[in-house]
Structures are given as structure tokens and as C-alpha cells.
Swiss-Prot record:
Native source organism of the sequence: Thermosipho melanesiensis (strain DSM 12029 / CIP 104789 / BI429)
Cofactor(s) needed by this chain: Mg(2+)
Main location: cytoplasm
UniProt-recorded name of the protein: Endonuclease V
GO biological process, one term: DNA repair
Length: 226
């Protein structure tokens, strides 16, 4: 799939932070305009000094259609809050290989529940111009109250009285997941779509399967490096 080139990735951390603040003003949150038929799940992992991006394509019945991946050397250091500069270029190379028209992309990571509203789901949402949702296992930014211990109970992640995400109990007796819109989707739709793709597991199928294949490919690549 094609994408829009927004900026150079060759930035020092201070300039990257400035850029995030500027890009956050370009985010749009609006209802989805078409029925959901295909979705993508994205997971990024690392093997030594290489980054691996995995994109899985699922239909609305959660059937796996295709797995895409790309691996290359990392060019940006690990800095909390700037992970998109480390992971984004690798994801975009994998995205270029995708030949399915997906309706929503789920990222393992955050959307606007980020200090500058620029988690990986938001940042990449601007590049690919597709509705994106961030699904995370840990809070990065904002305040919340723990939801009840019932499946699909939820509370909001807030910052300065603004709702920036949702804390969802996807299963009883497990820690909640943290959902936030990335771009071109509303907070409520981010929640409803996530719920639609949850089965018996904690994570929704798009990011769960992306992580599963990421681990398999990472192991394979790691063996090749030996």
C-alpha cells in the first residue's frame, strides 16, 4: 500500500519532540465512513540491532488472510515517547508490501494516550491516511480508575478532563488493556471495534496474531544470525 511521506526520519530527539507537537495538530477524529471488511494488526519487535515489523490481515470474521513482514537494521535509539521514530520506518517498509485494502489498522502500542498525542498508532495513521487504533498492555500517559472485574467493563483514560483513551477489561481476572484512537476514528468506535475482535484471549485478534507471528519470525531470524 502507498503512503504519504510526511517528514524525514533523520532527526535528533529534540527535533523529533518538536515534530510530534506539530503533527498532533493534524490528527482527525471522525466516525468511520464505510463498513469494516478487512482489518490489519501490527506488531514490532527487535532482534539484536534489527527491527521486525509484522502486519497481519484479517477479515471481519477474524479469519487470517495474509501475513506480511519486513526486517532491517534500527537507526534510532530507544527513547520512551519517541518509539515511532524507531519503529515507524520499519513498519512503512512492511506496509509498502501490503496489497489488501484494509479498513482499520490495529497497532500494538498507543494512539493519542501519549504525552504529545503521538503514539505509534497516531503517527503512522497520518502517514498511511487510514483509521488506526492503539492497543497496549500498559498505560503510557494519563489517569484512570481500574474497571470492574467483569468482561467488557471499562473506564476512561483522562488528561486535563479530556478523554484520551479507554481501559478495557477484555477478560475476567486478567489485567485490562489500554485502547486509544490513532487517527480518523472516534474513541467510541475504537472501543466497539476492539470488542468485536476479542475472542477468548486478552488481546483483540489483530494484535494478538501479529504478536504471534512476530515471535515466530523473530525466532527464525535469530537462528539465522547465529
Amino acid at each position: 500500500m502507498e503512503y504519504k511521506k510526511l517528514h524525514s526520519w533523520k532527526l535528533i530527539p529534540e527535533k523529533a519532540i518538536e515534530l510530534q507537537k506539530l503533527l498532533s495538530k493534524k490528527l482527525t477524529f471522525k466516525p468511520l465512513s464505510k463498513e469494516i471488511n478487512l482489518v490489519a494488526g501490527v506488531d514490532l519487535s527487535f532482534v539484536k540491532d534489527y527491527g521486525l515489523a509484522v502486519i497481519v490481515i484479517l477479515d471481519k470474521n477474524m479469519e487470517l488472510i495474509k501475513v506480511y513482514h519486513h526486517i532491517e537494521k534500527i537507526t534510532f535509539p530507544y527513547i520512551p515517547g519517541l518509539l515511532a521514530f524507531r519503529e515507524g520506518p520499519i513498519f512503512l517498509k512492511a506496509w509498502k508490501k501490503v496489497n489488501h485494502n484494509v479498513d482499520v489498522v490495529f497497532f500494538d502500542g498507543h494512539g493519542i494516550s501519549h504525552p504529545r498525542s503521538m503514539g505509534i498508532a497516531s503517527h503512522m495513521g497520518l502517514w498511511i491516511e487510514q483509521p488506526t487504533i492503539g492497543i497496549a498492555k500498559k498505560i503510557l500517559f494519563g489517569n484512570y480508575v481500574e474497571p470492574e472485574n467483569k468482561k467488557f467493563s471499562f473506564t476512561y483514560i483522562t488528561y486535563k478532563n479530556q478523554k484520551i483513551g479507554i481501559v478495557l477489561r477484555s477478560r475476567e481476572n486478567v489485567k485490562p488493556i489500554f485502547i486509544s484512537p490513532g487517527n480518523l476514528i472516534t474513541l467510541d468506535e475504537s472501543l466497539e471495534l476492539t470488542k468485536q475482535f476479542i475472542t477468548k484471549y486478552k488481546l483483540p485478534e489483530p494484535t494478538r496474531l501479529a504478536h504471534k507471528y512476530s515471535q515466530l519470525l523473530k525466532k527464525q531470524f535469530n537462528e539465522e544470525l547465529q
